[in-house]
Amino acid sequence: MHLLALHLLLFLLGSRAKAGEIIGGTECKPHSRPYMAYLEIATSKNYLSTCSGFLIRRNFVLTAAHCSGRSITVLLGAHNKTAKEDTWQKIEVEKQFPHPKYDDYSVLHDIMLLKLKEKAKLTLAVGTLPLPAKFSFIPPGRVCRAVGWGKTNVNEPTSDTLQEVKMRLLEAEGCKHFTNFYHSSQLCVGNPKKMQNVYKGDSGGPLLCAGIAQGIASYVRRNARPPAVFTRISHYRPWINKILREN
């Protein structure tokens, strides 16, 4: 498919292309996903957008590179993002580290680290999520869970409460219709026969497989039909480790 046609068909899951949601999923038990981060983003054009992300260290959040902006505030300890609780911790981002090879057109290398201005306080509602080992392989057929505050229907606003959905890992063949899909650095996720998917607003949220973050929500077709493309975290462990070590 020609790149222009691809971009007519696809949109980024993040708020730069309107915030997304979990379709066909269920509401999470409050604070059962303590690593989840809700990102409030002021773009370079002074628009407000949102993404999801997840805490991997007390002062670092992992998300998608297309969720970058002029400034970002991270909300931790939230379930309903519109109903303030004592569990909330709002922390500004000190520095954004989008992958140096991220391409906004092909959406390759869609991964970013956010260094927080202060360390999060670890509580029952705020915790960290482990990452996979370097270049570890997760086989197709595995059923994982995507988590985020995205839409629950294509024509609905984003969800106020945290949602999750079960999604199956597919062979690379399942995403052959995406011109720029690379199996080595991306995951093809979601049964095309089921209307269960991530969508706008879920960008940057994790794909959880046995309690480990294996993927980062990147993009999906405009009509929200599965499969979706996630950034494969294990491929980027050397880069992640370098940023964490040096900062």
UniProtKB/Swiss-Prot annotation:
Keywords: Disulfide bond, Glycoprotein, Hydrolase, Protease, Serine protease, Signal, Zymogen. The keyword Glycoprotein applies. It holds the Pfam family Trypsin. Glycans are attached at N80. One of its GO terms (cellular component) is cytoplasm. Disulfide bonds join C51-C67, C144-C209, C175-C188. It is an enzyme of class 3 (hydrolase). The keyword Cytoplasm does not apply. One of its GO terms (molecular function) is serine-type endopeptidase activity. One of its GO terms (biological process) is proteolysis. Its EC number is 3.4.21.-. Residues 1-19 form the signal peptide. SUPFAM superfamilies: Trypsin-like serine proteases. Belongs to the peptidase S1 family. Granzyme subfamily. PANTHER family: CHYMASE (PTHR24271:SF24), KALLIKREIN-RELATED (PTHR24271). This is Mast cell protease 2. It comes from Meriones unguiculatus (Mongolian jird).
